Swiss-Prot record:
Gene3D superfamilies named among the record's database cross-references: Zinc/RING finger domain, C3HC4 (zinc finger)
UniProt-listed GO biological process terms: protein ubiquitination
Identification of the protein by name: RING finger protein 44
InterPro entries per UniProt: Znf_RING, Znf_RING/FYVE/PHD
Zinc finger (RING-type) in chain: 298-339
One Pfam family from the record: zf-RING_2
Molecular-function annotations in GO: ubiquitin protein ligase activity; zinc ion binding
UniProt keywords, alphabetically: Metal-binding, Zinc, Zinc-finger
Amino acid sequence: MLHPATQQSPFMVDLHDQVHQGPVPLSYTVTTVTTQGFPLPASQHIPGCSAQQLPACSVMFSGQHYPLCCLPPPLIQACTMQQLPVPYHTYPHLISSDHYILHPPPPAPPPQPTHMAPLGQFVSLQTQHPRMPLQRLDNEMDLRGDQHPLGSFTYSTSATGPTLSPSVPLHYLPHDPLHQELSFGVPYSHMMPRRLSTQRYRLQQPLPPPPPPPPPSYYPSFLPYFLSMLPMSPTTVGPTISLDLDVDDVEMENYEALLNLAERLGDAKPRGLTKADIEQLPSYRFNPDSHQSEQTLCVVCFSDFEVRQLLRVLPCNHEFHAKCVDKWLKANRTCPICRADASEVPREAE
């Protein structure tokens, strides 16, 4: 029984599947396994490998690992296993429907001659791990020749298989599903419908309501001015209204504003004339023969003067019906025609 050395160097072995139509190169990954020995028949002799301890290696077909042989790096050229014929009908379950195919690396050196017996005479295959999709390697296999689909697998009609440079080490990849890709370059194809549905669900969500409008701004200079126009001061309103106002400053400001307004408006006068002021205005009976004014109608009622009608004369010498102009002067202090003050001339005459 062979015992592996303490220092193990991982490497890759190329297996070709023999079918009636030609050899079938399978996509596989060689990984190092736990230290163990493999019984070999006494009748089989491996040149250059019988006197040394060999590290263990394994072959993975479609996610399944199989122990194969023990070969140290110094004896790779003496004991090469690039082409090992395997009957196609012996392992039909290995040709699965996995869509994960390795991509080819740069070209390798020319093939070396085979120095070992067929695989079926001394290799015992056993399953170590459940099947899982192959993962992409940095050092990948070079598949050459005419490619023909066989079910969901791919085989070549060329007789010569690819070779592997002994100086390129291979590493065991952990089963990390984050780096799996399909053969046609679409990552996570089984997650795409769910991802699209999630985006559609996000698009269908209603938008949040708009924020409420801000409250109306407060103008502090308008309220004191409005309260100052009231007959009572803000301090006498009551305890329910508390205003942080400087009363002295507010009163001074309002007093100056009122003085400016009084200068522009002048002295305050009543709106109309009293009954006594109206009766002091001169009046007479209309006589067309003795009438000296050119005015023949009342502007208030737009009626012509008639005989024996009572007319009232304003200080501006405009004449009107007494009833019409008296009603007008109770609400206005000016003449309806020239807007002259009706109370100034009689007081000067007095």
